[in-house]
Amino acid sequence: MEFVTLTEEEFREFSMKHPMANFMQTTDLGDLKSNNGIKIDYVGVKEKGKLLCATLLEEEPSILGKKVFYAPRGFLIDYHNKELLKFFTDNLKTYIKKRKGFKLTIDPNLVYQVRGADGSIMPKSQKDDESFKNLCDLGFEHFGFNLYLEARQVRFAYRMMLDEPYDVKKQEFSKSTRKNLESTYKKGLSVRKGVEKDLPIMEDLFKDTATRKDFFYRKLDYYKEMYKYMKDLMTIYFAYLDPKKYLECAKENLKEEQEKNKEIVNKMEKDMIGAKLKSQKEASDKRLIKLENELKEAEEFKKNYPEGKDIACLLSMWNGEEFLTLTSGSLEKYRKFTPKYAMYDAHIKDAYKNGYKACNFYGISGNFEKENNPLYGVYEFKRGFGGNVIEYIGEFTLPITKFNKFYNFLRGIKRMIKK
């Protein structure tokens, strides 16, 4: 076996076809990072000319002229092949040491175990303890089985396997999810795909959500660069409110309820008014008031936005055999349209169309209790589409030199001072 540096072309060909392929281990992301001043390396192991494993490495400057190295969602390797893993790790240590690096961090795109939809450990689920042990035996230090967002990458995600036709899978959506989808489309909402000129709209929607929820968000320049280098991996969805369609749906919905209300009145005139009929009339009257107000809102919307308006956005990514929902944003004012459901539905349909094996709805927390859990709503929404919780193996750090201990000592002092 031979440890080698790789050209972008060699790495691209290998990484796009690997079983653990993901968007973080692509030359597309490497080019984006390079453009932002981060040194990118591509290395691997060959035997008789055949590439056996590889990884993208980020070089990050640290203190005193030293560097730390990071392989985001790497390596692309069979973690059960201990001989190959050891050879690669040993040579990486030498490679990194020569470049003044003192530690390497990895967070493999490796599922540690599949859990039930409710987060419970399933009886037949097997933990990938072999991969975990192989890494630890080689000196990798595990960050821990964290439940939240303490590490660089998410450790829990929600995944929907596309092993049955869409119409069958849709029956596995929760009742509330199916109801919200139906309601969303009945309100005149549609989904369109974005292009480069739509990036300012996307940034505004992400900013609105991030500001509302006190999240970090990236500026427009970042998304322009991201689109430049990663557009072949990206799909941008917009939930679009068309004024004409919105108004037509509002009129139709009101008309349907008026007819239902009239039928109830006719029954009340012919029959004795029972509690059930009276309750139906009261509920219908309330819906009529609501729908009349919605019609006024639709008329006002058409007046203010004759060209329509994008009210939500979803950014999805190629992730090997998965189609991944990376991030989303929406306008609070139009929350009642539940636009996220329509965008996720479009994402799922495209995943089927393009031959993906799964939809990865990405980050959730590992706390599945509703009480005192601010992230529960994210999990509950994604769970509504059916599927399972997946638990990644987590983050590992490999100390390269003794300087790592000194570095950790300084960080400890810094944390103490902050307290």
Predicted segments, located by residue:
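C-terminal catalytic domain of photolyase/cryptochrome flavoproteins
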Residues: 12, 42, 302-303, 364-419
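Acyl-donor binding region in acyl/amide transferases
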Residues: 66-150, 309-311, 317-385
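Residue-level detector of family-conserved "landmark" positions at structurally sensitive sites
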Residues: 106, 145, 194, 220, ...
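A short, hydrophobic/aromatic-rich structural module that often spans a beta strand
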Residues: 119-130, 151-169, 332, 401-419
